[in-house]
Regions:
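Alpha/beta-hydrolase fold nucleophile elbow
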Residues: 144-155
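Alpha/beta-hydrolase-fold catalytic nucleophile elbow
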Residues: 113, 152, 172-175
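An N-terminal hydrophobic leader/cap segment in hydrolases
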Residues: 13-62
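Catalytic active-site module of serine/aspartate enzymes centered on a nucleophile-bearing elbow/loop
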Residues: 240-258
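N-terminal Lys/Arg-rich, disordered targeting/topogenic segments
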Residues: 1-11
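The feature captures the conserved acid-bearing segment of alpha/beta-hydrolase catalytic domains
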Residues: 181, 192-241
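Membrane-embedded segments
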Residues: 67-139
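Hydrolase active-site cap/lid region
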Residues: 158-210
Length: 258
């Protein structure tokens, strides 16, 4: 009898503990669901070190959206050269790319922060994400009157880059993700499974008219598997890996192989 009572007591404690864990898990999932927009469309914090690094060689530019919101941007290089437009990752200050790039001979490298990021006002959302990216492309086209020759994007920015594909431009997808849902589920794993993510911004094959123009650049080792996943999903795109070379050298090599 005592053994039976002890066993029942143990089972009861285990079930009670499991119940507590389940309540905690459900609470965390519920919290992530409530705050999904902040994870899907985060605001990039101003990166002071990167901005200090590009002081004196980057020119400030801006892009006015349809609703009057002004986006800050930067351009490095001779503005009469072909333009490389860069879409930063969701939580990346655009200045960080230019600080790492330093310079790109033969190109004017331009990039803008999204609404709500850096010094920009506004609230990022799914409703404005892609339309803002199109306006950014148009603003970059005004730098010298010609559409960007090269369009690059990192992480979720790669989704925006591929949606600007044109017949003659070169696309460089740096450590890309297939969708915002993938990015969130990769970050939180079992805490917030992909099927729960409501944000619906993704790369699809319908976005691609000429896969030969697209190169996936596997830049950071921790995102290597992710880059291969995108490569397999898109098919017939080129993949290149960066090891110790400067970022500018790798990008120039990609543009020369076009």
């Amino acid at each position: 009898m005592k053994i039976k009572e002890a066993a029942l007591g143990t089972v009861s404690r285990i079930l009670r503990f499991a119940g507590i864990l389940l309540v905690i898990y459900i609470s965390m999932v519920f919290y992530l669901a409530l705050t999904e927009r902040r994870n899907a469309f985060p605001r990039a914090i101003t990166h002071n070190e990167a901005r200090a690094a590009i002081t004196g060689k980057a020119k400030s530019i801006n892009c006015t959206l349809d609703d009057g919101t002004k986006l800050e941007g930067f351009v490095v290089g001779n503005e009469n050269n072909d333009v490389l437009l860069y879409y930063p990752d969701a939580d990346e200050d655009a200045a960080q790319f230019l600080a790492e790039l330093d310079s790109l001979p033969g190109y004017a490298a331009a990039t803008f922060n999204y609404r709500g990021s850096g010094e920009n006002k506004g609230t990022p959302s799914q409703e404005t994400f892609e339309s803002d990216a199109q306006m950014i492309y148009e603003c970059a086209s005004q730098i010298n009157g010609n559409a960007p020759k090269v369009v690059a994007g990192r992480g979720t920015g790669a989704i925006l880059a591929i949606k600007q594909e044109k017949k003659d431009n070169v696309l460089i997808l740096i450590d890309p993700v297939l969708s915002i849902a993938d990015a969130i589920s990769d970050k939180y794993r079992l805490l917030y499974p992909k099927f729960l993510v409501r944000a619906d911004v993704k790369i699809s094959k319908e976005d691609i008219s000429n896969a030969s123009n697209i190169t996936i650049l596997s830049d950071r080792a921790r995102f290597c598997d992710r880059s291969h996943t995108v490569e397999n999903a898109l098919g017939n795109v080129k993949l290149t890996k960066r090891s110790t070379e400067p970022l500018s050298e790798v990008i120039l090599n990609v543009t020369k192989r076009k």
